[in-house]
Amino acid sequence: MRHIIAINLQNEAGALTRVAGLFSTRGYNIESLSVAATDDPTVSRITLVTRGSDSVIQQIVSQLNKLIDVVSVEDKTQGEHIERELVLLKLKVRPEQADAVRGYVVRAGGRVIDPASDGFIVELTANEAEIDKFVVDLSQGAQLLEVVRSGALGISRLTRAARLRRE
């Protein structure tokens, strides 16, 4: 099963290497990885996607919690969460198809961010399945020159009570 694991760790040299080393040593695969500082500049957040049974994921979380730089570890897929990924696509488009392709991009929730005479670069932020469909659909009307995906990011949802209070 696919899992999104969020790891907060000290923003120090070697911290990411230790996390990656844990996965490598134990033979676990990282499907996607994103790392950035949090609102606290001394703490970074790693969001990674991996696959495994519940017992394997529990073992991964347990081992991650033992690493010296790790502040917290959470399997986001264990609760309600929102997941997003960014994709950038460089498209070569024939002039007679440009309006149709541009229209599809907008209807799908994407944006043309760099138009050119022979194509454009587009972006879409969505979940993995929506991005997969977007890429396949665009490949029908345009030539995909380059596809760049960020990998998944995940955040736990607010509780229902907290959402109602905010409204």
Predicted regions and their residues:
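Long, contiguous binding/interaction regions
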Residues: 1-4, 8, 12-44, 49-167
